[in-house]
Swiss-Prot record:
Protein name: Uroporphyrinogen decarboxylase
Keywords: Cytoplasm, Decarboxylase, Lyase, Porphyrin biosynthesis
Gene giving rise to this polypeptide: hemE
Gene source species: Synechococcus elongatus (strain ATCC 33912 / PCC 7942 / FACHB-805)
Main location: cytoplasm
Enzyme Commission number: 4.1.1.37
Pathway per the UniProt entry: Porphyrin-containing compound metabolism; protoporphyrin-IX biosynthesis; coproporphyrinogen-III from 5-aminolevulinate: step 4/4
Amino acid sequence: MVASSSLPRLLRAARGEVLDRPPVWMMRQAGRYMKVYRDLRDKYPGFRERSETPELAIEISLQPFRAFKPDGVILFSDILTPLPGMGIPFDIIESKGPILEPPIRTAEQVAAVHDLDPEEATPFIRPILETLRQEVGNEAAVLGFAGAPWTLAAYAIEGKSSKTYANIKHLAFSEPTILHELLGKLADNIAIYLCHQIDCGAQVVQLFDSWAGQLSPIDYDTFALPYQQRVFQQVKAKHPEVPLILYISGSAGVLERMGQSGCDIVSVDWTVDLLDARRRLGPDIGLQGNIDPGVLFGSQDFIRDRILDTVRKAGNQRHILNLGHGILPGTPEDNARHFFETAKNLDQLLAASH
């Protein structure tokens, strides 16, 4: 057992230690709000080139670490990255987002989805994660991530981002057997992919079921929860010590169900008060979040006050400070810096405010 004080703060929080301040990182902390990222994007305009070339992905992952020293450094990648390795091709078009052609809508297409071999299909993952671990040492935890089965199925079936999810719901409610077959294959492949990330150096992994908030509770229980559980059970069987985070956008209606997924930490969006989230999830599930990314357009005093309010509600145990969603493009970089500086000084700020 490694001495606790030498472990990254984020791991200590995930294990339930009482800390003087919560660890902090931001979803999409490497991205368009940073000038260094925009400069690199101008030079390498293809998203897949940036995320699948080790040197570029390492550099991008480390940009916010060098600038702000967050307690977590997340792999720069995309939830769709492993899909081609299962026989589901995609591309990301600047300003349009992901395109998956042809969309998957028949039993024959689902039957053609095959097992993922991450070393072969995503060979860039190992050098990226190994290098990130070397670069950050114990100063931060390295996070891996993947998309959850429902959300990946939604992309594959819609063929692109959607506001209505009409195609996947059509399949769910008229031919559920086909959808369940796809969800099962995705769950097993995502478990393989997350275990591979852990083998390569990820110390914490987050499952993004970004679109599961679009489901009614009864449909969440049918199409989302069982497959989240299937992923987490397989990862826990191989890596019982690795903290698992589940994030859903618009999750207020299914919060308790998220706690049944097998995750250790529920990442909460800003529509739920953290005191309420604690009450609804119980003492054994950690919380991550949950500041509205729009707060970072406010004054620095406003940002500080919101951070203090959030941390007081969360308490000093099993909480990772984060936004409730990814940081927005156009966010002033100085305000992101202020967010991290405030978070890193919370022990003094909390003491001074009592």
